[in-house]
Amino acid sequence: MIQPKTHLNVADNSGARELMCIRIIGASNHRYAHIGDVIVAVIKEAVPNMPLERSEVIRAVIVRTCKELKRDNGMIIRYDDNAAVVIDQEGNPRGTRVFGAIARELRQLNFTKIVSLAPEVL
C-alpha cells in the first residue's frame, strides 16, 4: 500500500534511485496505490550525470509492494521492498532495463513493455 509521502526504490536504470509519492493517479478518492497503479512522484535521490535530476516531478508505475497481493487462485505474493518504474506520459518506461522481479498483473494493465524488460515475472 503506497500513499502520499511514501518513499520507493526505483527498479530501472532511468537515473533516479529513490522516489517519494505525492499523488495517486486515477479516482480522486484513492487513499492507497497498489501494484500497477500510476503515481506522481518526486525524485529524492538520483545518479549524477543522468537525464533525471533530484527534485524533478515524474510519473511512475508501482511494480513491487511490501503489502501482500492476493490472486484469484489463492496465491499470495509479497516483496521485500516498495519499488516503481519511471514512465513517460504514454506509459513507456524511461529506462532501458528493469531490475528485480515484477508481478504478472502488469501485463493485464497494458504495461507490456515493462514486462518484456523484466528479468523475472511472478
Swiss-Prot record:
Domain of life: Eukaryota
SMART domains on file: Ribosomal_L14
Similarity remark: Belongs to the universal ribosomal protein uL14 family.
Subcellular location(s) per record: Plastid, Chloroplast
Pfam families to which the protein is assigned, alphabetical: Ribosomal_L14 (PF00238)
Listed name of the protein: Large ribosomal subunit protein uL14c
HAMAP family: Ribosomal_uL14
Organism for this UniProt entry: Chloranthus spicatus (Chulantree)
GO molecular function: large ribosomal subunit rRNA binding; structural constituent of ribosome
GO BP term, example: translation
A cellular-component GO term for this protein: cytosolic large ribosomal subunit
Keyword Disulfide bond (UniProt): no
Subunit structure: Part of the 50S ribosomal subunit.
Gene (name only): rpl14
Function: Binds to 23S rRNA.
Keywords for this protein: Chloroplast, Plastid, Ribonucleoprotein, Ribosomal protein, RNA-binding, rRNA-binding
Gene3D superfamilies noted in UniProt: Ribosomal protein L14
